[in-house]
Amino acid sequence: MAEKNKQDDIKVIATNRKAYHDYFIEETIEAGIELKGTEVKSVRLGHVNLKDSFARVENGEVFLYNMHISPYEKGNIFNVDPMRDRKLLLHKSEINRLAGYVQQKGYTLIPLKIYLKRGKIKVELAVAKGKKLFDKREAIAKRDAELEIRKKMKEYLR
């Protein structure tokens, strides 16, 4: 039987685009997430917001904070708090490695995206270091310069 392409069965549900602007991404890791039934349905519909969310290692477990999952419309009494803390599912060795990173000054854990992989909801978690204001300005200036160069080259080649 033919092998399936691994990229074919990944469907991105939500991304944290601000994370790349506000942080230097050091390392990424894939984690499962513990959700209730109506939360799963809401996430599959794309009603999730990663803005201002972060993760923290506590007592050998990793929890995701400030991630908003809108209540499922047809969930009535089964809906839970949209901003509740959610446990991330990782191996103990991965948790220990992340804890070592986070103990260093300036490092934090942030979710980059939520996606479906083989029917399971996964979170791409990043070890990140915050950018200073001048770093952000430098990145914007560099991006603008590259855009200007591309425009000039396109104009020149016409």
UniProtKB/Swiss-Prot annotation:
One of its GO terms (biological process) is trans-translation. The keyword Zinc-finger does not apply. InterPro entries: SmpB, SsrA-bd_prot, SsrA-bd_prot_CS. The keyword tRNA-binding does not apply. GO terms for molecular function: RNA binding. It is found in: Cytoplasm. One of its GO terms (cellular component) is cytosol. Pfam families: SmpB. PANTHER family: SSRA-BINDING PROTEIN (PTHR30308:SF2), TMRNA-BINDING COMPONENT OF TRANS-TRANSLATION TAGGING COMPLEX (PTHR30308). Belongs to the SmpB family. Required for rescue of stalled ribosomes mediated by trans-translation. Binds to transfer-messenger RNA (tmRNA), required for stable association of tmRNA with ribosomes. tmRNA and SmpB together mimic tRNA shape, replacing the anticodon stem-loop with SmpB. tmRNA is encoded by the ssrA gene; the 2 termini fold to resemble tRNA(Ala) and it encodes a 'tag peptide', a short internal open reading frame. During trans-translation Ala-aminoacylated tmRNA acts like a tRNA, entering the A-site of stalled ribosomes, displacing the stalled mRNA. This is SsrA-binding protein. The lineage of its organism: Bacteria, Bacillati, Bacillota, Bacillota incertae sedis, Caldicellulosiruptorales.
